[in-house]
Structures are given as structure tokens and as C-alpha cells.
Amino acid sequence: DLVNYPLVKGESRPVRLFNRDSNEAFYVLQTGLAGPAGDSSAHPTHLATFAADAPRYDLANGSDELRVPLTWTDAASGVTVTKTFIFRRGQYRIDLEYTVKNAGAAPWSAAPYMQILRDDVVLERSMFNVETYAFKGPAYFDGTKYQKLKVEDAAKEPLARDVQGGWIAGMQHHFVSAVVPSGDAPYRYTMKVDGRQYLLTTAGPMRSVAPGATETLKETLFVGPKLQAQLEKAGPELDRVADYGKLTLLAKPLFWLLEQAHKLTGNWGWSIILITALLKLIFYPLSEASGKSMAKMRVLGPRIKNLQDTYKDDREKLGKAMMELYQREKINPLAGCLPIVIQMPVFFAFYWVLLESVEMRQAPFLAWIQDLSSKDPFFVLPIIMAGAMFVQYKLNPTPADPVQAKVFMILPLVMSVTFAFFPSGLVLYYTVNTMLTIAQQWNINRRIEAGRTGRD
């Protein structure tokens, strides 16, 4: 149980990653040492029985590390294996240490393995449920490439490859269980599918322990929220499980900026506002070009209306007359599009940062918004957003096409209804961005109209 992460804010029931007993989806992480093929002697697999020295282990006050040793002994071979889980305060990384002591008369061999066995629950994607947008399923990293796996594909072509310096993971929105094998030798990565259940395994090379010798094997687990600072330290590029999709290259630095803003403000909501303003400032030269084009089009509004009235029955002549007007006034009606297109990947990347980052989960902002990852309970932000979009529409030139003009009129209402079910952090970002755009466009319109009046 992740006791610091309630399933529902304000309730005591925590998020539970693994499940083997209830009626919910089966999900376990298994570790052990397996014997050579054909060897019928006992080995400490995940099915073996281990003994604990105490019925309960607690992290003592003033201590930052808790070691939980479990012991397996095979009288026939004279081998004792101590399997120690090492927990650290405030960390979701778990170090796994095997100490193999061979007191027998013959060499003893075993290979370490770790595996994730999980039911694949198919979620029907819904625009009103952001949980369905995040990837949920198996993934691995081969030292170079990060790969998300589809269960249906693995059923047709099972995964089987040798990897050194990688990891495997079972992913879901905001949380992950990951296995990071020792990087000192290649491990065999496999995935098998039985119905809707998958088994993702990493198996190491066979290790031999001579009579009278003691050997130690070390592996790493990570079980918990996708806290990127901790993920980076737990395994090579393990922070990739904070999955921003194809916009990762842009999203990573944006998340870093958001973290720095949070260090200043101590509040993720104010951090969103601060970074939104920073992005607006960075892109001001580009958005100013777009704004100037729209402002000039707005000034020409009455003249365009006259042309529409004059050539209302001849669309060909209307188009020609409008192009001549644009040429005389040195206006390119498409000039404002390119700056917007250039900015879109950055804003979509920021969207994914807010959607995927566990730091936003149940993070409070203001009085009525106590969870930036959930919808606004009173729909205040969507209403403000709709009002801001309407003001923005009024600042822009009226479309020549009456149908298009009506579409733009009702767009704020449509967007507010849609965003009413989105996480309030996303709505906050969009609302602040719209309000900053209004301020910028109003200032540009004022300057363009003042310059026009001076010439007239």
C-alpha cells in the first residue's frame, strides 16, 4: 500500500499497486533464484518458503534504512540463501540482495529472475476520463530504446531478447512497478501472454557458488509513484516511465521548469500560472506577429464588410476584391498561422506534463480547488475560461463567412463544457494562457488602431 497516496483525496484507503487476493485485477511482482534446466533439486524461487527472524519490521525513528532478511535453507545441498529487501525512508526504490552460502560438498548453481504477472484490463478511452489517456501495461528499456508493449501483439509474437543495462516495468497512470536487473551481465527479457494476463520476465545468467564459498547478488526494484527525481537514481533512464509520449523531448525541460517554479511558490497551481506566463513571454515575438496580422484584419473589418455587401452575389469577384485589398494594405491573411503552428508542440507538451506528472495528483491550489488532477467541483474555472474565450473572440477580426462566425461564437460554450470534465490543472493552464493572450491582443490592437488613426 502507498500510504502517502490516498485512492480518493480525503479518504484513508491508499493506492494499492499489487493485488492477489481480491476480485480486482491480479497483479504481482515475483523474484527468486531458479536452477539450471533439468535440475530437480530445490531452489529459492518465488514459490519457495522463506523464514523471517521477526513477525514485523518497522523503520525506527532516527533511522533511514530498514533491512528485512528472509532465509531459505536446503538441507540436502547444504545451501542457505538470505534474501534481503532494503527499504529507505522517503524512497520508493527497494534494493534486493541475495546472499548465497554453500556449506555443501558440491557446487551450487542458480540464476536470478524477476517478473511481473498482471491482468491486462482494457479501458475504453473517454475524453472525460484522463486515466484512459495514460498508458497502462508492460514496457521495457533495452539500454537504448524505450518500448511500450501491447498485450495483443505479444500474444502473436512473444518478446525474447538479451539486454544489458535495461529494465522492465508494469505501468499505469501516475504509478509504476519496475525491475532493474544488475548491469554486469546480459539478462533475458521475455513476455508471454495467457488470455488477458501477461508475464514479463527478466532472467539473469546462471551463477555458480563453490563449496564453502559465499556469493552476493544484487538487484533493484521500484514500486510507487512516478517521481522523476527518484526514478532517475533507481535505474538507467527509468524516468521514461513518466511517459509524455512523442513530445518527451519538449516535455522534460518543461517539467524541470515547473519543478523550479514549485520551489519558489510551494504550490503547483501557482507554478502552472508562472510557467504559463513564462511560455507566453518566450513566444511573445512569434505571437506578436500573429496578433499584428489579426489586428490589421480587424481594422479592415468595415471595408471588408462593404466588399461583402457589394459582391454578395458573386463570390469570385468578392475573393478577388479582398485579395486586392490585402495587397494594397500589405496584409497576408495567413501570416498569423505560422507562429501559432510553431508554438503548438510546446503547448501540447505542457498539456502532457500536467496530465502525466504524479506531482499534480491531489495537489491543492485555491479554496475550492483541492486537487489539480481532478475536475473543478464547482465548474468555476471552465466558466471563467468560456468568458475569456468569448472576449478573445471579440478582439479578433470577425470571419468573413457567416457560418464560421457563428461557430466561433458558440466555441467558448463547447470548450467550457468539454473542459468541465478535465483536470482543473489543465483548465487553469488554458484559462491563464487565454487571459494572457487577451492582454497581448488588446495591447496590439490599441497600438495598430492608434497608428491607423494617426495616418488618417
Regions found by a protein language model. Give the residues of each.
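Soluble non-transmembrane domains of integral membrane proteins
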Residues: D1-R240
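Helix-loop-helix
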Residues: Y98, A111-P112, L117-E131, D194-Y198, ...
